[in-house]
Amino acid sequence: MICSFQLIVVFCNVIFKRGVDKMHLAIAGNIGSGKTTLTTLLSKHYKFEPHYEDVEDNPYISDFYEDMQRWSFNLQIYFLNARYNTLLQLQKNKKNIIQDRTIYEDAHIFAPNLHSMGLMSTRDFETYQKIFESISQTVKPPDLLVYLRASIPHLVNNIQKRGRDYEDSIRLDYLRRLNERYEGWISSYKPKHLIIEVDNLNFAENSEHLGAIISKIEAEVNGLF
């Protein structure tokens, strides 16, 4: 059995053997899946620089949940720009980073979902797609993407526990549609990725659960399976 310290050493050695001086990990998943919590815990464990989804300072998010059709395009463009800037920062510096949600989730899940629900016009959606296509040519995917797979009851429970006022109006059908799109997206995602089933995990409070996730990440990076 390899101890935790040995795994950390192996993980760091992999980074240097790959001939790179930085690692980009990304945490993906639906609203309430635990992305931000896991990002924080992993950033402390690996001493990586965390990059969080800009939610609290987002000038559109509260308006969006009150009137999705009116503010959907504004919100998605804001997120697209914020995540693009994060990727530009990664390319400029030599720091290892861990990212809370990716630019691909915006383009392949949230924006198409809003369009299919009639909450984003075809004109706005096509404009969004053109912007993303231009951006995507200038950035690389993360070295490892960790997808947190969660059921609707698990998502709802987490959303209720964190108590964000603007999330009170999130509809169940909205979460279901997002979950369906996440599953479709991850099944066709080609770069290196890892799927974690989180319904029966409490990595925020249980160190063994967190340790199990860390072991899977390190094994994936090191090519142990």
Provide a role label for each language-model segment:
Residues 156-225:
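NTP-dependent small-molecule kinase module
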Residues 3-22:
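Short, Lys/Arg-enriched N-terminal segments with co-localized hydrophobic residues
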Residues 35:
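Conserved lysine of the Walker
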